[in-house]
Amino acid sequence: MSCSQERKSDFLIVKKDSLQYEGKSVELFKITNKQGMAIEVTNYGASLVFVSAPDKNGVFEPVVLGLDSLRHYLGRQPKLGATVGRFANRIKDAEFSLGKTVYHLDKNSKAHSIHGGVKGFNLQVFDVDTSYIV
């Protein structure tokens, strides 16, 4: 587990965890603003895994469902917080027409294609450059 911090304008960015998955580095970042609200995101599936916001009394509480560790997000988990794409929902018979062209997609839900196909965005490891976080 590695932990590094970087201040970007009004946010504190902390790399909380990092592990190797299929030859790539999967990382977990915590971003906290000056008011104390925090989110955690991972570059695996561009997933939002934690949000802490104040309640009516100003007490910060988690407000989204999440899994216990970064490792639990890998593979075919329930897609909690993941980015859906290149499309969401099912495409019947895994094909669609655009103009006069018929496009055939991966079948990953019986005869249909769902949530980006076999290797949708939720299963991608995205590159992270924290210099772009403002």
For the regions a protein language model found, what residue spans apply to each?
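Surface-exposed acidic/polar loop and edge beta-strand patches at domain peripheries
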Residues: 4-134
